[in-house]
Structures are given as C-alpha cells and as structure tokens.
UniProtKB/Swiss-Prot annotation:
PANTHER family: DNA POLYMERASE, DNA-DIRECTED DNA POLYMERASE. Keywords: DNA replication, DNA-binding, DNA-directed DNA polymerase, Nucleotidyltransferase, Plasmid, Transferase. One of its GO terms (molecular function) is DNA binding. The lineage of its organism: Eukaryota, Fungi, Dikarya, Ascomycota, Saccharomycotina. Belongs to the DNA polymerase type-B family. It catalyses: DNA(n) + a 2'-deoxyribonucleoside 5'-triphosphate = DNA(n+1) + diphosphate. This is DNA polymerase. It holds the Pfam family DNA_pol_B_2. GO terms for biological process: DNA replication. Signal peptide: none annotated.
Length: 995
C-alpha cells in the first residue's frame, strides 16, 4: 500500500542541509534518489528530536518530584505516615476482531484497521453501567470509585496506538461514549498525518484491530475468604466443576492455591504465572453474582481482564484455571462437560476436539411482537440460541442477542468451521420451515446466495447457502419427527426432567418488555373464558403465570435465554437420538441423504423392493387423471350427545392397506373396458343411492367428499376399481364413460401383488416388535413413524415449481411471480418447472387410500350388529354404541380370519370407552372416559376441533353448537402468518358452527 509521509518543513530543510554537507554532489543526484534520502534523514531527525524531548520531560518530572517531596505534599507523594488506598478493578474488554459482537467492522479510509461502528460501542452501554454500578455498590471502601474507558489499536499482538481515557459518569454515559468515539477519530487522523512509527497500520498484510477497554476501580478495605460468605467449605461443587476455596484465614490464598496445585509456596500471583509459563486462565463471576454460592454453571463466570490466557471458550487440561472474586483466589478443577439431564442448560465451554469431521447446529429464535396491534405484529428476533454438535457430541450452547442474532450465529459458526477446517454444516430448527428459516432470509447480506429451495404449503422444507467458504444445509426437524418438540422429547428422551419448559411469551410485546423483572415460575397456563353474547358463544383466554416460592428474579431477556437454551438442548438431544437410531437400525446415514421422513421411508422401501417389481411414473396428463381418484380418509359424524360409546382405532391402517392388499406395478395401459381381475382407475358417472346406510363409498357433492349426507344428483369423477366395487355394493349407480377421443375409460395394470408386504411386515414390523421386547422406546418410535409415513411419498403432488431469490432490481415483474422478502431488497421468485413425468408413482398412493376404506368396511361389516350406526369415524377410527358392536367378531385379513380387536397391524385397538360423547361435525368431537390411577377413578377427555387450538376446546363449545341448528361460536386465539423473511402473530377471530 502506498502512503505519504507528512513531515514538518524544518525537518526536511535540516535533512537537506545535512545531506549537502555529506555529499558534495548531492544536487546532481537523480530526483527520486534525492527524495528518498531526504525522507529517510528527516524521519531519523524527527525520531531523535522526539526521544530528546522525552528525556527532557523525564528529567523535569524527577526534579518536580523532589520538590514535592521536600514540600511534603502527601496528596502527590506517599510518605511513610500516609496510608495509600489499594484499588481493585472491575473491567472488561471487547475486540473488533469478535465477529459476534462486531459482524460488520468499518475500515477507516487510508488505514488497514478493522474499527468498531459507533452503534456497536453504544450497544455496550448497559454493560458499562453495570460495571460502574457494581464498583460503586461496595460499602466497605476507603474512597470513592473511579471509572474510565479508552481504545487501543493492536497489530500482531502489539499495541500500536491508544486514545486518552475518558471518565465514565452514569448520568452522562451517552455524552462520554460520544467523546470517546470522537477521540478515536482524532487519533486515526493524527496517525495519517504523522505516519512515522505507524507504518504497520498502512502496509501490514494483516488487519489491525481495535480493543475497547472499560475499567472501574474501587478501593476496598483488606479482605479474606470470609467475604465469600460465612463457613465456606474447602471445596464447593458446582454443575460442571469444583472450586477449591482456600478457606484458611491464617494462610494467604496465593500460598494455599499453589500448595493445592503443585505443593509449592508461592507468595504472588506473578510467581504462579511464571511457574506455568503463562499457561493460566483466571476467571471471575458475572457481574450479577454477589455470592460465590450463587454460581450454578459456566454461564455464571467470565474471563478476568488480567488473565494471561485470553479465552475461556475451549477447555484445555494443560491450562490451570484460577477463580478470582472479591480479592480472594481459588482454584477451579475437575472440569467436566455440562450434564444434559437438567431442566435448563446454560453455556458450557467446548472440550478440545482434534478430529471433527461433521458439525450440526440446532438453533431456535425467540422474538417479541404485539398480536393486538397491527403495526407491531411482525415477530422481531431478539435472541438466537445455538447448540453446536461436533461429530455426534453436543458441545457448547451459545446465545446471540439483538435484531441481527441470526446473522451473528452464522458468523460464529463460520469462525468455528475455519478453526476446525470444516467446509459444510447441517443447520436444524424445529418447525424452522414455518418460522426460524424465514429469518435466515432476512438476516443475510445477500439472500440470493440461497439455493435449492424446497417449499411445501408456504413452508420451507430445506435449502442451502454458502457463506465465507462454508456450505450450510438447512433442514426442518419437524419434517422428520412429525410432532411438537414437547412430544418429541417424550418420545425420544429418557430423562424425565429433560423436557421443554414454559415461557410467558404473552408479556413480550415490545423491546422494552425484555427488561421487565420476573420472579421464577413453575408453569404458564392458559385459562379459557367463555360467555354467550347475542346467541353467540365467545371463547377467549388469559395467561396465568404460576410463580415459585423462592425470591429468584431476573429480567425476561435473561429468563428467555434459559428457556431458549433449554429448547435447543432438547432439540439437539432429540435430533441425535433420532439420527443415531436410524443409522444404527439400518446401518446407513439415511437422514443426511433425505429432507423429510417420507423421503427417508421411500428410500428404505427402494432398498427393499422385490427385484422383479417396477413402479412406472405416469406422464403429466395421466398423473392428474389418476390423482383425481386420490381421496383422503373417510370422515363422518352423526351429530349429537351420546353415552356408552366405544372408541376404536385401527393399528397402523395405512401400512396395513399397503402390506395386505394388492398394489399395481409394471406398465399401465389405457383401456376402453374394465379388464377382469386387474387393478384400474376409471372415469365414471355416478348417481348416488340415498337409501344406502353403509357409507363407505366417497360421494362427491358440492366439490366436497361426503359419505352420509348427499343429494341424488349425478356427477362425473375418477375412482379406483376398489372404490367402484364398494359403491356398487352399496347400491349406487356407476357407469364407465370415455375420457379421451379414443373411447378409453381409464387405466389398468396387468400386474398386481403385495409388493409392500416384505418391507412392512418382514422388515419394519419385525423390527418394531424386536424393540418393544427390548423396551427400546427410541428405536420403536423411529420404526413406527417410518412405517406410517411411507404412503405419503406415493401421494406426492406434481412438483412443477422451482424457487430462487433475486434482487428487486433484476426482476421482470411482467413475467416473474415475485414475493417480497421482509426487510430486504430481495424477492422470492416462483417459476414453473416443466416435467414430462411425475417424480413418484401416484397410482400406489391412490390405491393405498382406497384399500384403507375397504379395510374399514370389512371391519365394520364383521363387527357391527344389525341396525348399528357409526356415530363418528375419521380415517382409522370408529365410534359406536357399546351394545351395537361385536368385540369378539373376526374378519378376513391377508387370507386369514383374524379377530377384529387385537394388537397386530390392521386390527382394531380399544382405545377407551366414552361415558359421554359430544359430536358437532367432522373433526369436531369431545369424549369423556374413566380410568383408574392408584385405585381411584379419574376422568380424561379425548377431543378434536379442526382449526382450533386444543386448550380452547371446551365442553361448553359443543353444548352450545348442539343446542340449535343456527348456533355459532367465536373463538379468539393467537395465530401466525408467514410472510417471506418474517412471521406475523395476530389474534384470529374464528367463527364455527356444527357441520
């Protein structure tokens, strides 16, 4: 880098005279050579002049000191009879090298220095004030505390320059910070003007960095271990380490610690540091810790500013760890990894990993928003917690604070990858596709770097992006676990205390709410209120926080860190349990090769397919014709209030429908008539028979599917031969009609067979039984969800869209479908992707659902008594009066006559017997049943009301809706709406009625 030296003219003139005296022919030398000689000589003269002035000032200072001593001015020179106050400092420092604190350092024009932005320095205001308040809080002091701050510029570990210190006053903190920043700007300008001595700031190949240093000094009276508290034991045991307290009052703490560590008798800390060659790390409690016994974990301690080792991020057993608190020294020893079996886990340092090959980051975001104010409904992130998994070991949990917390996390992970030479990272969030992943978009400097975007129902399935040489693969754990994190922790974790906790999210509406002080709580409950207003039932809620009896209090932002850390630790544990179980069961890292559980199950099926079976993928026209025959599970409701009702569920209905019934395979053909003994999908005209009481044929009425409430109006539709045969048996009039100009009525497969039986029955189900016998609930649950998810991949929609992100300036709005990404200048582009063939064989998904209806009909026909009525049914369930059903009946399954009630795949399970059942429509029921706990009868409920959160489903809702045909209810509850790059939370006012 070129630079200009701005030396005063008198140095240049003197240098010129000196050179002319030395070289007689100086003026005849080449001009460039003369300028170099003048510059070098002038620089030397200036340096000599500066050194001379320093020596003169030192001499003057000595003379003035002698004068003060002779004048006996005690305020300036300590005399033997004058007591000096020994100061103790509280300090902290931050470096612009820290990409978490300063993700976007600015480069001062002309200098190779990474500087703090002013807003970053001002963000430290609360930390500075806490330091000042702590130093001024001590009562037993000799004089008033003093506080100050300054900047230093470092290059290759050396201090190059510094600002003058600025005193800190609590009531003028903003003004003082502004003065300090102005001082720093002045220093940089002077460096550019002077240049000499600062060459490294111009020409160094490496950047220089700025360190912000804040210090507060208080002046305590002499202290001992008693200042840690009374009767402090020799050893204190904490969550992840032990502390030697050096609790003997008659021996110095330095000597006690050196004896404890090395059987040495050192008298100063410097001697200890020298003995260990500087390999000592000194830590001290966080500012909020006033008693050593309040320390719980690593999260409650911080690096001491005078520590020789300047990092506490990685625990190294070759380092000695000392604990300094209230002028007393102790020793930290027996450092272990944080235990994972507690309710809330806080930050714990890494253990040094030498051979890391894979990094997974599980993260979660906490945000504030006001659902009742439209202008404040956007969820604003304020905390992002990340659990770093090294290979298959959970390491540290780190939290990032601020609106840019997600960006901070990404930068932090990149730094770790750089240290460990890792080039790819798996990034996991639970329900991230519907929430957390949106904030990755709005946190990136260039969202267009995001590639391979997969979206389903406006939720991200996955995507990837590269940042600073690290490739991030983003996945949603919900796409694999298919349940809430709370339920996943119950299914996959053995520790009873290791579970998701409650948090009063309702009180976090603005940034100011983050600093509300809350006592510790045990739970947060939602209390449901209901009232009838003008014939309409109104259901609302209020949140009740149940506080504990202890006096522990913290701000909500501090509580949220505990909550968020616990969540990511639970997610990390669940994700590892799931991945490890899949790998252990199938001897393959399948999760890394797939994006969803259905995709994983599909890959497993492919690996276990019969060699002579091919499943042909239809072209676009045939696909959409066949998909018209894809009809979801049977759902009926006979509204009313009932007593003594059996609640029956088929065990693994869809796996049974795939394993025990013929499926089409091989090539298919268009046919003009229905071939005998072949499976087919046909275009038909249907005239329903209203006298039918069986209700297993899906009738299309007013663009909906119904089974027991329809008109005798003729319609045209696609059905499988399985559904057609059910319809004919129920007396419906069904006629085959052509769908193309060649007179073809549908599609037929000449090959059929139980192609899923081996995979489901001989592989998955046998594994499930094996793990049940071993009482291995983790592997049992893995097999269960894999088995139940397979059919979904065969019913996959036509994938005809691709997504990518572009800058607003690059979009052709006339031809491109674009969606704004919140808080950025980028947009998500949705583009049609032309494909010739479907990605999956849709016909097998269609037949799975048809056989499921056939299976349910077979069970009903075998178990229902004459005149029995199915009160309610939804896909795999049957609610029927107890006296109307034969529990001991048998039906034909896979060529065998088996009991309808049993524990095998395809049989009914008696879940409970309702004492009372309220039905108000499809997917709108509530049943009460009795069970015994410790010999005492208890009442439990099973309920469902589609579109309504579970805790708002109350008996009064059903009673009101069933009291009259025109009765309505309005339910007010919190709901979220995704807007690319952000999420909005708002109050939904949903009106419902009996259907």
């Amino acid at each position: 880098m070129n630079y200009i030296i701005n030396l005063k003219m008198d140095y240049k003139d003197k240098a010129l005279n000196d050179l002319r005296n030395v070289y007689a022919d100086f003026d005849s030398l080449p001009l460039d050579f003369r300028q170099i000689l003048i510059k070098d000589r002038a620089t030397l003269l200036q340096k000599e002049d500066v050194e001379k002035k320093i020596l003169e000032r030192q001499e003057d200072a000595k003379k003035y000191a002698e004068y003060l001593k002779q004048s006996e001015i005690p305020e300036r020179i300590s005399l033997p009879n004058i007591k000096r106050h020994k100061g103790v400092s509280i300090s902290f420092e931050e470096t612009s090298e820290d990409m978490v604190l300063e993700p976007r350092p600015f480069i001062f024009d002309g200098l190779n220095i990474r500087c703090f932005r002013r807003e970053t320095i001002f963000s430290l205001k609360n930390k500075i004030l806490n330091m000042v308040k702590e130093s001024s809080s001590f009562k037993n002091v000799s004089r008033q505390s003093v506080s100050f701050m300054y900047f230093k510029i470092f290059n290759k570990g050396k201090v190059i320059a510094s600002t003058k210190s600025v005193n800190i006053y609590e009531d003028k903190i903003d003004e003082r910070l502004e003065d300090l920043c102005n001082n720093f700007d002045d220093v940089l300008k002077k460096i550019i003007d002077v240049t000499y001595g600062y060459e490294s700031l111009f020409v160094s190949e490496t950047y220089s960095y700025v360190i912000f240093y804040a210090k507060s000094i208080y002046f305590p009276q002499p202290r001992c271990v008693n200042n840690w508290g009374n009767n402090i034991p020799n050893i204190l045991t904490f969550d992840s380490f032990k502390l030697f307290t050096a609790n003997k009052n008659n021996v110095s703490c330095i000597k006690q610690c050196s004896r404890f560590l090395w059987q040495k008798d050192f008298n100063t800390l410097e001697e200890m540091i020298e003995y260990k060659n500087g390999n000592i790390c000194i830590v001290t409690p966080q500012l909020h810790i006033n008693d050593v016994r309040d320390i719980k974990s690593f999260n409650d301690i911080r690096l001491y500013s005078e520590s020789p080792i300047k990092t506490f991020s990685v625990i190294d057993n070759t380092i000695t760890y000392l604990f300094y608190f209230k002028e007393h020294l102790g020793v930290i020893f027996n450092i272990t990894k944080s235990r994972h079996d507690r309710r809330v886990t806080k930050f714990s340092p890494l253990s040094k990993f030498s051979d890391v090959k894979n990094i997974t980051v599980c993260f979660d975001i906490e945000s504030y928003f006001d659902p009742e104010k439209e202008s404040n409904q956007v969820n604003i992130p304020f905390i992002c917690c990340a659990s770093i998994i090294y290979n298959k070991v959970i390491g540290n949990i780190v939290d990032f604070e601020g609106r840019d917390c997600v960006a901070q996390m990404i930068e932090y992970v990149v730094d770790i990858c750089g240290e460990l030479n890792i080039s790819s990272v798996e990034l996991i969030a639970h329900n991230g596709g519907g929430y957390d992943f949106h904030y990755i978009l709005s946190s990136m400097y260039n969202p267009a770097a995001i590639k391979n975007i997969l979206i389903r129902n406006n939720s991200f399935i996955s995507f990837n992006f590269a940042h600073d040489g690290v490739k991030f693969s983003v996945k949603d754990s919900y796409s694999f676990l298919l349940c809430s994190l709370a339920n996943a922790s119950k299914a996959f974790l053995n520790e009873e205390t290791f579970k998701k906790t409650d948090f009063p999210h309702h009180d976090l509406k603005t940034a100011d709410d983050l600093y509300k002080v809350y006592k510790e709580w045990s739970s947060v409950n939602t209390e449901i209120n209901h009232v009838v207003e003008k014939e309409k039932l109104l259901i609302t809620s209020e949140h009740i926080v149940n506080f504990t009896k202890n006096d522990k209090s913290k701000t909500l932002i501090e509580w949220s860190k505990d909550y968020c850390r616990n969540d990511v630790l639970v997610l990390s544990k669940v994700w590892l349990e799931f991945k490890n179980a899949v790998e252990d069961i199938f001897n393959c890292e399948l999760v890394d090769q797939t994006m969803t559980l259905a995709g994983l199950s599909y890959k497993l099926f492919q690996a276990n397919m019969p060699f002579d079976v091919e499943l042909r993928h239809p072209n676009k026209e045939d696909y959409f014709n066949m998909r018209e025959a894809l009809i979801g599970g049977r759902c009926i409701s006979v509204n009313g209030i009932y007593k003594d009702v059996l609640c029956l569920d088929v065990k693994s209905l869809y796996p049974a429908s795939m394993a025990f019934y013929d499926q089409p395979y091989g090539s298919f053909k268009r046919v003009s008539s229905r071939p005998k003994d072949e499976l087919g999908i046909y275009y038909v005209r249907v005239t329903p028979n209203r006298n039918n009481k069986s209700n297993f044929f899906p009738i299309r009425s007013h663009n909906k599917i119904t089974y027991n409430n329809f008109e005798e109006s003729t319609y045209i539709a696609w059905y499988t031969n399985v559904d057609i045969d059910i319809g004919l048996s129920e007396g419906h009039n069904i006629e085959y009609i052509p769908f193309d100009s060649y007179g073809n009525i549908g599609y037929s497969w000449s090959k059929k067979g139980k192609i899923f039986e081996k995979y489901i029955k001989d592989v998955l189900y046998k594994l499930k039984i094996k793990y049940e016998k071993q009482n291995n609930k983790v592997k049992r649950n893995v097999i269960k969800i894999i088995m139940n998810s397979l059919w979904g991949k065969f019913a996959q929609k036509w994938v005809n869209f691709e997504y990518f992100i572009k800058s607003e300036d690059d979009i052709d709005f006339e031809s491109e479908e674009a969606y704004k990404i919140w808080d950025t200048d980028f947009m998500l582009i949705k583009k049609i992707k032309e494909s010739t063939y479907s990605s999956k064989p849709i016909q097998n998904g269609v037949f799975t659902l048809s056989w499921a209806r056939y299976h349910m009909k077979s069970i009903w026909d075998a178990g229902a008594k004459e005149g029995a009525e199915c009160i309610y049914s939804d896909t795999d369930s049957i609610f029927v009066h107890k006296e109307h059903f034969k529990k001991n009946a048998k039906f034909m399954l896979n060529g065998l006559k088996v009991p309808i009630i049993g524990s095998e795949v395809g049989q009914l399970e008696l879940e409970c017997e309702f004492d009372k059942l309220l039905c108000a429509g499809k997917k709108q029921y509530m049943g009460f049943y009795t069970y015994f706990q410790d010999g005492k009868p208890c009442i439990k409920e099973k309920k469902r009301f589609k579109g309504i959160p579970s805790n708002y489903i109350i008996p009064e809702l059903y009673a009101h809706l069933l009291s009259g045909a025109d009765k309505e209810a309005k339910i007010q509850f919190l709901k979220f709406r995704r807007e690319w790059g952000s999420v909005k939370g708002y109050i939904e006012n949903k009106t419902v009625k009996a259907t």
